[in-house]
Amino acid sequence: MKPSHFTEKRFMKKVLGLFLVVVMLASVGVLPTSKVQAAGTTVTSMEYFSPADGPVISKSGVGKASYGFVMPKFNGGSATWNDVYSDVGVNVKVGNNWVDIDQAGGYIYNQNWGHWSDGGFNGYWFTLSATTEIQLYSKANGVKLEYQLVFQNINKTTITAMNPTQGPQITASFTGGAGFTYPTFNNDSAVTYEAVADDLKVYVKPVNSSSWIDIDNNAASGWIYDHNFGQFTDGGGGYWFNVTESINVKLESKTSSANLVYTITFNEPTRNSYVITPYEGTTFTADANGSIGIPLPKIDGGAPIAKELGNFVYQININGQWVDLSNSSQSKFAYSANGYNNMSDANQWGYWADYIYGLWFQPIQENMQIRIGYPLNGQAGGNIGNNFVNYTFIGNPNAPRPDVSDQEDISIGTPTDPAIAGMNLIWQDEFNGTTLDTSKWNYETGYYLNNDPATWGWGNAELQHYTNSTQNVYVQDGKLNIKAMNDSKSFPQDPNRYAQYSSGKINTKDKLSLKYGRVDFRAKLPTGDGVWPALWMLPKDSVYGTWAASGEIDVMEARGRLPGSVSGTIHFGGQWPVNQSSGGDYHFPEGQTFANDYHVYSVVWEEDNIKWYVDGKFFYKVTNQQWYSTAAPNNPNAPFDEPFYLIMNLAVGGNFDGGRTPNASDIPATMQVDYVRVYKEQ
């Protein structure tokens, strides 16, 4: 459960990006990069990586701006950052003198400067409010390379006029993707979005409606930021939308009558028949990773749209018989909704979207025959007849398949007996008393991080304030209850902002911390829109910097509206916004949910890997080859080599589920915890 911040989505990635490629790369551990290993080479020369990476980099912003550049080419390109990092220092010019950045004053690693690592590249980032000169130097040889980071302050202003730079008539793709760059404000191209952002509102309506919808933090309307609309940064930035019907988008000034209306047209095709034909080719060869991507067939000569996807039938030929791909026991394929899961050795498949829709498959090691069918009447379950397109897959026998030898299920204790063979119980709370045991737990209270008004809702836009009241946190009948209630309250940090709900959050900081081991929570979770129960861990000391450079382990998080699944995640990398995460989902067997019974949520944390389980069943693993901390590039286990403490809470709203808010019937909501147990191996 992270202290999240505003996340920008790139329009090209969201709408036109190579979604399949990104999924495939991420699935095989390419994103993010492996951590830096031990170094020993000294720097004999440095040159700028590209013209965009120095010597002069100019940025503008309201009060401050963020800069980043790729590491220079070391030793004529023969040495990498991994080789030379221990020999590279950073100076800042103070007056006319070069001063080590750690001695210059005002520069705090992982707060306003640091390292980044992404996609095989490394570099530096800085957040600055004035033009600054930076010098990289070799500690051994005195080689230097200088950068000038030029800052131009943007003064906030209000909007008097807007003119489109794209549109205002825009046609959405077959998948519903569309977008436009920010307009020209006040008839002056020098007036940026940042200068007027506080004065700008966004409204949406169907083209055949007269009622505008304010989509700012209004998940109840169905418009959820970073889900079906958002902002991108490429080309100066703008807005993106995913639509299923034609809509109008209105940008409007809060302080004047200036507004601009766009029309995004979604052309739903007219089908004269439902005969399908190949989109492009019918023979596909697996790549080095064993992955294959195919576009879905055309229907009556046109690409399918979202509402038609459920009508398709996908089959594989097994020993001369056609078997539904979804019948995993016969097809030997597992559907993966979130991209390739490199913790599973199963053949996997799923959908991708990149202007059109398609399917991905991985790892394909053998040749096989696939066919896709569509009902002749266009209705799900209708007669298909011979309306199939047949595909030939040429497998790659050398494609990697994950090793799952250490992914066996684990034994769990019973509600009355914590004993587990091979494990020592080192801490527990069975909640058998009548009140919360404050020798084991602390209350967290309030609505803001560090009393900063900008961090309302705990930095996540959550809607609850936390209390130490027994109406929100109480022990009854051998269970801990954390209860969210309708209980509006404002705080001195911003008297005009109200937290609509109260709830509970407790932790073991300074009372229990562990470095490696196993944690079991047995809990029953609440359902409801915007209800967000979590069991998680944070570092006792932020040795590697503020979130997420020092790490976070989410044992379990759940979305109340989706009672059939929970997730486990780690957060790592650098301080926001260069943080990274890796996680997986557990799907309950048919007939079970996280709300209809108690389930045991476990994390097993070892020096070089972390694994997640539900009721003893393995569902996800991450290794130290996938995590890192930019503050300790030569430490293979950072940041997960420091003590962490436990946290339990029940949040409402927030960014985890796209800003969704509860219905009236969803509150009160209660998370019940039967026990928390901490083990070490014998």
Swiss-Prot record:
The active site is at E552, E557. GO terms for molecular function: glucan endo-1,3-beta-D-glucosidase activity. It comes from Niallia circulans. Its EC number is 3.2.1.39. CDD domains: GH16_laminarinase_like. Keywords: Cell wall biogenesis/degradation, Glycosidase, Hydrolase, Secreted, Signal. It comes from the Bacteria. It holds the Pfam family Glyco_hydro_16. One of its GO terms (biological process) is cell wall organization. This is Glucan endo-1,3-beta-glucosidase A1. Its main location: secreted. GO terms for cellular component: extracellular region. It catalyses: Hydrolysis of (1->3)-beta-D-glucosidic linkages in (1->3)-beta-D-glucans. Residues 1-38 form the signal peptide.
